[in-house]
Amino acid sequence: MSVTSLSFPYGESICWYSPDELDRLPDGALADWLLASGSLTARLRAHCSQFEVRVLGEAMLPGLPGEPQLPHTWVREVLLILDGTPWVFARTLVPEALLTRCGDELTALGDRPLGELLFSSNLFTPGRIEIAGFHSCGTLARLAESLGQNVHGRLWGRRRYFEREGDELIVSEIFLPAAMDYILGPQ
């Protein structure tokens, strides 16, 4: 699995919506995955024997269009890998004020999943979920293809807000084609 021909950051501008606003919220299993209120990390672990986080990059960067435009935001992008297959591309945005308060809690995660920190303590309060269904021909499609996964339809994802002391951390999770194939099952 090589992503060397690409470079961090991989995220792209995505239009996110409240599930109430989306005209065509997917039915069945996909909607269940998108709207689940618990930890996606825990749910993914339940579907594999080996779970891995591969960090693609971390840095102070400006937000993309459609993201909060704060002067200083720490961005972390990772792949969540199940039994050797990348399932989820995740992009986390942490405003500088929150990063200053949290310090190493966030910046020293390394290959540990952020979801474990967010759901294992009462320091963060899970908030609203937004979803997106989109046709990617940009960096996410190229990332998927570099991982041996062809984007053959819409990619779906969710964006979750977590509040701590008045600041919001945002986690966007995009289901890669391998995950979509599993969730949707045989067509």
Swiss-Prot record:
* Gene3D superfamilies on file: Chorismate lyase-like
Where is it located? Cytoplasm
Per its UniProt entry, what is the enzyme's top EC class, as one word?
lyase
Keyword Cytoplasm attributed: yes
Q: What InterPro entries does the record tag this protein with?
A: Chorismate--pyruvate_lyase, Chorismate_lyase_/UTRA_dom_sf
Q: Name one GO biological process term.
A: pyruvate biosynthetic process
E.C. number, please? 4.1.3.40
Q: Which reaction does it catalyse?
A: chorismate = 4-hydroxybenzoate + pyruvate
Binding-site residues, substrate: R76, L114, E173
Question: Which Gene Ontology MF annotations are present?
Answer: chorismate lyase activity
Pathway(s) annotated for this protein in UniProt: Cofactor biosynthesis; ubiquinone biosynthesis
Q: Which UniProt keywords apply?
A: Cytoplasm, Lyase, Pyruvate, Ubiquinone biosynthesis
The UniProt entry's sequence similarity note says:
Belongs to the UbiC family.
PANTHER family, sorted: CHORISMATE PYRUVATE-LYASE (PTHR38683:SF1)
Protein name per Swiss-Prot or TrEMBL: Probable chorismate pyruvate-lyase
This protein's species is Shewanella amazonensis (strain ATCC BAA-1098 / SB2B)
